[in-house]
Amino acid sequence: MGLGGDVHTLLAGCGHNVHVAAEDYLFHTGGPADRLYLVRHGLVALELVGTGGSRLVVDTVTAGGVVGLSWLVPPYRWYLDARAVEPTDAIELDADCLRRKCDADPRVGYLLLQRLVHQMYQRMQASRLQMLDVYGAHSDR
């Protein structure tokens, strides 16, 4: 994620390493968004559950990416499912710890937020391109 030393220090006190087996879920839609994952190795699919239980992969996250941005915005609930497509190693960060540290040092909180907003922007752009692919670039108007 390209974080500076101050942000690394902030993150170090809030997280621990986790291993997620292939096909296991990091979280499910509607659950409490109480953590953030920094993917170190592996592949995670972000999925929407459609009618009849069908799943639509809206994005994938690889090494260096972030999974779980919903901890930033109340009501702190997941709006997607996150599934490890292959064995995945990540740093799991506690959201309450991150919010407390960001409140205590707004400068570091701002640096972290800048990087996370960049991740959000990339996801939004990927979704936009996916919609153009599905629905076409032209309108019938």
Residues covered by each model-derived region:
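Short phosphate-coordinating micro-motif centered on Lys-Gly-acidic
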Residues: 26-31
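Glycine- and acidic-residue-biased ligand/ion/polar-headgroup-sensing regions
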Residues: 23, 34-47, 63-65
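Polybasic "coupling" helices that flank or enter modular domains
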Residues: 85, 111-141
